[in-house]
Amino acid sequence: MVEKVPMTQGGFVKLQEELRFRQQEERPRIIEAIAEARAHGDLSENAEYHAAKEAQSHNEGRITELEDLTARAEVIDLSKMSGSKIKFGATVKLIDEDSDEEKTYQIVGDQEADVKAGRISISSPIARALIGKEVGDSIEVNAPGGAKGYEILAVQWG
């Protein structure tokens, strides 16, 4: 059975845009660079040719990965999400029980995660600790610097 990859609509659109860019813009540019480098003669010591071939390999690998991800995508409609329990797509406001620092995170798919933008992967330790919890609950997360405790202040959808 094919394993579905949960993601938001925004994350799915970004993957589609990257796939289109790599297939329709990057691929032709690299093919042109290979042809140009090939025209310079001896391929054994042609750094431009080898760099272009390496770029082609990287680009084609990413295209294959993106095609697989978009085919297996399970787009979750956040506008239809509700409830008090935390699950995929929830935006959660937490307070660090040690420093009283407030943090807000949205739980998203692995491909969409960007901690600096407040989006954490559903498979991250903090998201796994949050799933199924509600406002007022406390969680403990084993972080690289030791265990950290958080209290859940709010859960929002959409």
From Swiss-Prot:
Keywords (A to Z) from UniProt: DNA-binding, Transcription, Transcription regulation
Pfam families recorded: GreA_GreB, GreA_GreB_N
InterPro entries listed in its UniProt record: GreA/GreB_C_sf, TF_GreA/GreB_CS, Tscrpt_elong_fac_GreA, Tscrpt_elong_fac_GreA/B, Tscrpt_elong_fac_GreA/B_C, Tscrpt_elong_fac_GreA/B_fam, Tscrpt_elong_fac_GreA/B_N, Tscrpt_elong_fac_GreA/B_N_sf
This protein's name: Transcription elongation factor GreA
GO MF annotations, alphabetized: DNA binding; RNA polymerase binding
PANTHER family: TRANSCRIPTION ELONGATION FACTOR GREA (PTHR30437:SF4)
Taxonomic source organism: Agrobacterium fabrum (strain C58 / ATCC 33970)
Keyword Phosphoprotein belongs to the record: no
Protein's job: Necessary for efficient RNA polymerase transcription elongation past template-encoded arresting sites. The arresting sites in DNA have the property of trapping a certain fraction of elongating RNA polymerases that pass through, resulting in locked ternary complexes. Cleavage of the nascent transcript by cleavage factors such as GreA or GreB allows the resumption of elongation from the new 3'terminus. GreA releases sequences of 2 to 3 nucleotides.
HAMAP family hit by this protein: GreA_GreB
Similarity-based family: Belongs to the GreA/GreB family.
GO BP of this protein: DNA-templated transcription elongation; regulation of DNA-templated transcription elongation
